[in-house]
């Protein structure tokens, strides 16, 4: 029998009818299986956005690395990661000019925090890549394992010390010729159960000592494990998120502390505040734009979305920002803060568990671990997977993919917000030196942009200039997903 779809809704209140197409009701989708495919997508896409960069080889790990910095200037509207160092530094300088003393004050605050933070700060957080076991563990366990291994290798780490001392150990560990770790392994054997007389699989867990040479250790220290982001609504495709190991975490924490301190002083930053305070900030920006605009002026707001924000950001750019922000600070402080972006420039993405294969005819299932993707015959894969593997092969080392460009999800939210705000800051009339000007709010990859101008041409010119300025620092405003309204009606980080 044919069902007329409109009949289905006749007896249904409008509210309920809407909810059938609305992604926020019911159970959120969870992902099952391995995230290997999604991670390969991320790695391949990130390289594609930076493909015109320069290839080099990391002398320590042998990993091929792509550096898009100061790459070709954009000629089209395709998303790209070719940030120009001088443009980023210029934007930082203007940000400081608009907020005298902001960087120095934030550095002083951060310096104090750096000297007081204890190691146990790193036990906060969920799943963390545990480099000693090469898999995810709760943060506290991963930290304990790292400290235990450090100690047995002659470093001075302890669980109650300062974080900065632990980070000194991390630095020393990277200079060591080899690191000895204790790994766990499973033995399976088939035995007959005495009671039921059936065959059962018995598992025993053993421990064995393993030596990692410098190269293997560095690869693990620079590895971000990947998982599939769960419970994302309104999306057809899942995506991969990263969980860094303990060597990287402490350094990232200090960088984000500094960036958070800067964001707190910026009226255009939607972080670190949330909820009502964020709405209040937005209201203030709108009020400022309305108050300062002449009656004859037009005001439009863009609810913006950036294309693949973190895949087009670049750690080398963050290094340049940090170098500039901390330029008047003591050497030790500058060094501690520059390590996170340097590690990210040399990061490796772990491809997860690999692929499941099953043979219908023989009722067999087997897992192909990520380590085998470099050598396995591609005839076993379908076409799309085959293309992915072919693309990623030159980047593979020990089941991890070299991923120099891009940031991975959720890593430097605060610092990337500072970069976004620095472009919003350039919209002041004294900088644009024309009839249009802009302001807005930035919260990680989300932004609201308000443009004022005497006429529609001016608005268009202002939006264009904002778009192009963003391009120069590796931010790609999505022309498909951003929409423009009269100021007063728009959405920001729903």
Swiss-Prot record:
The keyword Nucleotidyltransferase applies. GO terms for cellular component: host cell cytoplasm; host cell nucleus. Keywords: Eukaryotic host gene expression shutoff by virus, Eukaryotic host transcription shutoff by virus, Host cytoplasm, Host gene expression shutoff by virus, Host nucleus, Host-virus interaction, Inhibition of host RNA polymerase II by virus, Nucleotide-binding, Nucleotidyltransferase, Phosphoprotein, RNA-directed RNA polymerase, Transferase, Viral RNA replication, Viral transcription. It is an enzyme of class 2 (transferase). GO terms for biological process: symbiont-mediated suppression of host gene expression; symbiont-mediated suppression of host mRNA transcription via inhibition of RNA polymerase II activity; viral RNA genome replication; viral transcription. RNA-dependent RNA polymerase which is responsible for replication and transcription of virus RNA segments. The transcription of viral mRNAs occurs by a unique mechanism called cap-snatching. 5' methylated caps of cellular mRNAs are cleaved after 10-13 nucleotides by PA. In turn, these short capped RNAs are used as primers by PB1 for transcription of viral mRNAs. During virus replication, PB1 initiates RNA synthesis and copy vRNA into complementary RNA (cRNA) which in turn serves as a template for the production of more vRNAs. This is RNA-directed RNA polymerase catalytic subunit. It comes from Influenza A virus (strain A/Chicken/Hong Kong/FY150/2001 H5N1 genotype D).
């Amino acid at each position: 029998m044919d069902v007329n779809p409109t009949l289905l809704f006749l007896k249904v209140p409008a509210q309920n009818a809407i909810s059938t197409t609305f992604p926020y009701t019911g159970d959120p989708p969870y992902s099952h299986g391995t995230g290997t495919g999604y991670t390969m997508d991320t790695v391949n896409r990130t390289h594609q956005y930076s493909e015109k960069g320069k290839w080099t080889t990391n002398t320590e790990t042998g990993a091929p690395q792509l550096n898009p910095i100061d790459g070709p200037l954009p000629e089209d509207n395709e998303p790209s990661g070719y940030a120009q160092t001088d443009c980023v530094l210029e934007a930082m300088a203007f940000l400081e000019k608009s907020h005298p003393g902001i960087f120095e004050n934030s550095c002083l605050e951060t310096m104090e925090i750096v000297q007081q933070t204890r190691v146990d700060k790193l036990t906060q957080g969920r799943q963390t890549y545990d480099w000693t076991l090469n898999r995810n563990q709760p943060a506290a366990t991963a930290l304990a394992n790292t400290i235990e291994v450090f100690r047995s290798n002659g470093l001075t780490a302890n669980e109650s010390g300062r974080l900065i001392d632990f980070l000194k150990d991390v630095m020393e560990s990277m200079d060591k010729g080899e690191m000895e770790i204790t790994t766990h392994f499973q033995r399976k054997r088939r035995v007959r159960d005495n009671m039921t007389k059936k065959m059962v699989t018995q598992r025993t867990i053993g421990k064995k000592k393993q030596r990692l040479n410098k190269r293997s250790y560095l690869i693990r220290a620079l590895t971000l494990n990947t998982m599939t982001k769960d419970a994302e609504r309104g999306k057809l495709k899942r995506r991969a998120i990263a969980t860094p190991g303990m060597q990287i975490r402490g350094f990232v924490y200090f960088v984000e502390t500094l960036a958070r301190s800067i964001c707190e002083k910026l009226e255009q930053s939607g972080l670190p505040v949330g909820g009502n305070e964020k709405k209040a900030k937005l209201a203030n920006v709108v009020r400022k734009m309305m108050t300062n605009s002449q009656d004859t002026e037009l005001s439009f707001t863009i609810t913006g979305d950036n294309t693949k924000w973190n895949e087009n950001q670049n750690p080398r750019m963050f290094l340049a920002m940090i170098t500039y922000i901390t330029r008047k600070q003591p050497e030790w402080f500058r060094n501690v803060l520059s390590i996170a972006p340097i590690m990210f420039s040399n990061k490796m993405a772990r491809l997860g568990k690999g692929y499941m294969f099953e043979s219908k005819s023989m009722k067999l299932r087997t897992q192909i671990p990520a380590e085998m993707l470099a050598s396995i015959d591609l005839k076993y894969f379908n076409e799309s997977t085959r293309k992915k593997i072919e693309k990623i092969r030159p980047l593979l080392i020990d089941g991890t993919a070299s991923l120099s460009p891009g940031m991975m999800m959720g890593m430097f939210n605060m610092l990337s917000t500072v970069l976004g705000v620095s472009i919003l800051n350039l919209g002041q009339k004294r900088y644009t030196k024309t009839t249009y000007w802009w302001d807005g709010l930035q919260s990680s990859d989300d932004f609201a942009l308000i443009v004022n101008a005497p006429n529609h041409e001016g608005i268009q010119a202002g939006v264009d200039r904002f778009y192009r300025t963003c391009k120069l620092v590796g931010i790609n405003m999505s022309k498909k997903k951003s929409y423009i309204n009269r100021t007063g009606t728009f959405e920001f980080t729903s």
